[in-house]
Each structure stands twice: as structure tokens, then as C-alpha cells.
């Protein structure tokens, strides 16, 4: 049974080079409209990315990241608890903290201890992501083998969570993202192995998990389709993740995911009711 308590992150990219064209919103008015629509159709949180992080992404300065997110934060000032900023730039992260966002999402997993005092003083939640690269954006050179992946991810999170906790960050603010696609390996088998073993990861780590598989490279490699046609495979992977312990899912299609969760819950209720009725019939 899928769970309504799953938190859905809708992906909003304020970029011109994100790998999925339909997620790009560079003009401020279009970004605001897209964010409001995401919240309307099923996003609990809008995850705002001012820079792409795929292997071919162009670098964006912290000043440009801040310039891109500022108008959106102005427009959503009364819903900041539903805004996540997806950036690994400390300057951008500090700006987001000052604006009072609900979440910071760092693909490097918050590696800079100099930022920890600012994080500890805030109350936002932190999406701490694992990547084989350890720093920077995804690359095609990280080759984490399937058989090594779970142990490597657990070791990374044990060390990073310990560092954050020692700096005064409460455990209930931490959300762990094992990374997917190129963040693990160009080989789809590594991501498939991690996705198949989410319950093991969750048991080992004891903290909420966020899974971000939407339109990732390993899905395309598995089903033989381009990014634009990976909506169904993405939804299937997301539902699998939720059914196997994911507490948060980051997606390009929050409305579709929310509808699928709602239908699954309704079906489960009918199944439970029918089972009870059969029990009464045989009493």
C-alpha cells in the first residue's frame, strides 16, 4: 500500500540547460506560474534549481543563482515552508536560509563545515544527497559498482550525518537521498540495485529517504527510450520507491504521482474492507 504521508517534491528548474526541456523556466513570471500550479496539482514542496547538475551542465555563479531564485521567493513569501532550494553553492544556501525556505537540497551532501553554524541556527530541513563524485555536478566517470553501492552509501551517510549532528543539526531535520543515475554510475545496474534495496538502506540509516528517479538516465537505458518519453517509467519507479520505504519523492510530474498515490490508497481501502467483509461472512 502506498502512503499519503509521502512528501512530493515538484521539480522546477530555473535554467536553460536542464536535461528535461519541459522543466525549464527561466523567465520569472513563468517560474511563478509553474510553481503555483505544482502546488495546486499535488506538490507538497517546490524544489527550485537555479543550476543544472547533469554531466553536460554549464556552470552558474552563486550571484546568478541568487538572481534567478529571488523573484520566485518574493512571489512565494507566504509559502516559504513549501519551497526547497536545490544548490550546492554556500552563498546561495546562505541566501536561501535568510529568506526562510523550508528545505535546502545539496547534491554534494553539505560537505563544507564552514556552513554548519548557519545551518545549525536555522530550522529548515536538509536533503543530504550521496554522489559517487563527492563534489561538483554529476559526471560520466563515477563507476560505483552495484555490489559496492549499498555499503558505500551507508558509509557516506554515517560520516556526514555524524558531522552535521556534532555541529548542532537535529536528526529530525535530516533527509537522505542515495543519489541515482549518473550520481552513482553511468551503468544502469547500480541505480537499479539501489532502488531495489531501499528497505535495506532505510533500516541501516534510520532516517527518512528521498528518492529522485524522474526521467533519469538509468530509466532510459533500461526501457530504451529518450528522456521525453520516460514519464511512465518514472512513475513506475517512483511508486516502487514509495512502496519500499521512500518518505519523499522528487519528480517532474507531481500531479501524476499524487493521483497514482490517491488511487492506490483508495484501492487498498477497498481491499481491506472486502477482506473484513469476507471474514464476517465466514464468522
UniProtKB/Swiss-Prot annotation:
Pfam families: Pterin_bind. GO terms for molecular function: dihydropteroate synthase activity; metal ion binding. Keywords: Antibiotic resistance, Folate biosynthesis, Magnesium, Metal-binding, Transferase, Transposable element. It is an enzyme of class 2 (transferase). InterPro entries: DHP_synth-like, DHP_synth_dom, Dihydropteroate_synth-like_sf, Pterin-binding_dom. GO terms for cellular component: cytosol. Its cofactor is Mg(2+). Disulfide bonds: none annotated. It catalyses: (7,8-dihydropterin-6-yl)methyl diphosphate + 4-aminobenzoate = 7,8-dihydropteroate + diphosphate. Its EC number is 2.5.1.15. PROSITE patterns: DHPS_1, DHPS_2, PTERIN_BINDING. Signal peptide: none annotated. (7,8-dihydropterin-6-yl)methyl diphosphate binds at residues 86, 105, 177, 216, 250-252. Mg(2+) binds at residue 13. GO terms for biological process: folic acid biosynthetic process; response to antibiotic; tetrahydrofolate biosynthetic process. Residues 6-262 form the Pterin-binding domain. Pathway: Cofactor biosynthesis; tetrahydrofolate biosynthesis; 7,8-dihydrofolate from 2-amino-4-hydroxy-6-hydroxymethyl-7,8-dihydropteridine diphosphate and 4-aminobenzoate: step 1/2. Catalyzes the condensation of para-aminobenzoate (pABA) with 6-hydroxymethyl-7,8-dihydropterin diphosphate (DHPt-PP) to form 7,8-dihydropteroate (H2Pte), the immediate precursor of folate derivatives. Implicated in resistance to sulfonamide. Homodimer or homotrimer. The sulI gene is located on various large self-transmissible resistance plasmids and on transposons related to Tn21. Belongs to the DHPS family. This is Dihydropteroate synthase type-1.
